[in-house]
Amino acid sequence: MARLKDVYLKTVAPALFKDFGFKSPMQVPRITKIVINIGLGEALQNPKAVEAAIGDLTMIAGQKPVVTRAKKSLAAFKLRQGMPIGAMVTLRNDRMYDFYDRLVNLALPRIRDFQGLSRKSFDGRGNYSIGIREQIIFPEIEYDKVDKIRGLEVAIVTTAPNDEQGFALLKALGMPFRD
């Protein structure tokens, strides 16, 4: 079992149950999945960019990503329907907890001038999104082998019905928020 899952089950879930006064243990918010996405605008000029991004995402997530393709053609961007424009991976269960643990304890502290994450990135339904500007903050990525610095988005999906409960869950699991 993942270390963070054990922490959640033994300390975080009972504390949230008590704090919010839930009637059933199934009401306690939990993380359901983490979606990591890399959008590749340069994939139109450089088809090898998709393969490089897939390699980076595989190293970061520990799981093979799926290539995302354009839904519609857009003449302004010289984009045709079905062209590869990104890569994404959905993590659940143990891989999700392992990634969250590495994100909070290893990757985020390596960001330059890191002051903590904003509380405003919740979506109103308890889900949290983080934009990361450089994939090299993850220890799995070797700086010398990176062809281009790319950003990525991390969406943390929870069962929390509102931002207050989502914030309490992520804060209890060690997310470094700005106060």
Swiss-Prot record:
One of its GO terms (molecular function) is tRNA binding. Keywords: Ribonucleoprotein, Ribosomal protein, RNA-binding, rRNA-binding, tRNA-binding. GO terms for cellular component: ribonucleoprotein complex; ribosome. PROSITE patterns: RIBOSOMAL_L5. GO terms for biological process: translation. Pfam families: Ribosomal_L5, Ribosomal_L5_C. The keyword Ribosomal protein applies. NCBIfam families: PRK00010.1. Part of the 50S ribosomal subunit; part of the 5S rRNA/L5/L18/L25 subcomplex. Contacts the 5S rRNA and the P site tRNA. Forms a bridge to the 30S subunit in the 70S ribosome. Belongs to the universal ribosomal protein uL5 family. This is Large ribosomal subunit protein uL5. It comes from Herpetosiphon aurantiacus (strain ATCC 23779 / DSM 785 / 114-95).
